[in-house]
Amino acid sequence: MLKAVILIGGPQKGTRFRPLSFEVPKPLFPVAGVPMIQHHIEACAQVPGMQEILLIGFYQPDEALTQFLEAAQQEFNLPVRYLQEFTPLGTGGGLYHFRDQILAGAPEAFFVLNADVCSDFPLSAMLDAHRLQRHPFLLLGTTANRTQSLNYGCIVENPQTHEVLHYVEKPSTFISDIINCGIYLFSPEALKPLRDVFQRNQQDGQLEESPGSWPGAGTIRLEQDVFSALAGQGQIYVHLTDGIWSQIKSAGSALYASRLYLGRYQITHPERLARHTAGGPRIRGNVYIHPTAKVAPSAVLGPNVSIGKGVTIGEGVRLRESIVLHGATLQEHTCVLHSIVGWGSTVGRWARVEGTPNDPNPNDPRARMDSESLFKDGKLLPAITILGCRVRIPAEVLILNSIVLPHKELSRSFTNQIIL
């Protein structure tokens, strides 16, 4: 018997995902046509012996989350439950706080997945590796280039046994090109080190003179408090993958993740990909179109395009490397490139909405997405264009490398701006 835990965080996380996270919790943002964490749940449901999937976070259980959980339970015929933390508890605190629910039914092991990663989720391969050598912690690792590895948790392994000898979260100097994917397989014994950290935090808290400044005994950071401390003690091992993987920290990385998932649909869900049909729009590459969307036959879509529920695409529209969300309208002959068009937004005819891709270097197979800040030297860096919810773009204007916050009605062109 197996279980899975998906760590979905909470509203004060995902600030780099704004303005998109204003409308829906980041884990429910549609990537390649389905909510981000549905990819995780699909992968978990395919593992033989999976009995239950738990979501842990500190979002209020609103209508969107409740509807998603109900739909997921029906689709995958598995219990999918949300466990709400009373306060942000870090990547490990929620696991310890809800340990009784996780261990109910005596699972052989349980997967732990961060919500903000895109992957092909080689969970069965991880389970096989775990059953060959049973250890408390198994981490999924991949490689990054020397410079970008500093942005991730870095793993030094024993090449023969794959034991983790050293672990540093976001080191200041180069440690290793093997990085942590944020996908784990834990045995029930893995909760004992979490208990030790909790008890140590309790003692430290009692010694603190100003308890108001102390985050609380329940806050446990898996990476710093557990992995770094236990590395080299024969408890943590790494399983390397060369499959697709990327973090989803910013809106730009959601667009890149959409491309990776759409490419993977060729193998896993070919029925989700649009096909060129007589009298239909021209399809280039991998495109997802929701069944309720209305697309004019003279439109040209793709590659890497995802069109949401109730979207209207007018005659002569050109759409490439973009996500168009629920209820948006692209009027005749608009051109949308490297952009995300928000819920219920309207782009006027002959308007152009364009961004600059921030993709990994295609000439470096180990390159990853750069999660840079929006600004450098006081200037907005070129990036994808994002239109928030219910934005209105007039006819015949250009919106380039800009972020437009929700409910704005523009009257002219903008370049390299954040429109508040």
From Swiss-Prot:
Q: Where is this region: Hexapeptide repeat domain?
A: 273-420
- Name the encoding gene, please: Gmppa
- Protein role: Regulatory subunit of the GMPPA-GMPPB mannose-1-phosphate guanylyltransferase complex; reduces the catalytic activity of GMPPB when part of the complex. Mediates allosteric feedback inhibition of GMPPB catalytic activity upon binding GDP-alpha-D-mannose. Together with GMPPB regulates GDP-alpha-D-mannose levels.
Region Substrate-binding domain, residue ranges: 2-251
Question: Membrane-spanning residues where?
Answer: none
Q: What is this protein called?
A: Mannose-1-phosphate guanylyltransferase regulatory subunit alpha
Residues bound to GDP-alpha-D-mannose: E85, Q247
User: Mind listing the GO molecular function terms for this protein?
Assistant: enzyme binding; enzyme inhibitor activity; molecular sensor activity; transferase activity
Q: Which UniProt keywords apply?
A: Cytoplasm
Signal sequence residues: none
Tell me a GO cellular component.
cytoplasm
Family classification: Belongs to the transferase hexapeptide repeat family.
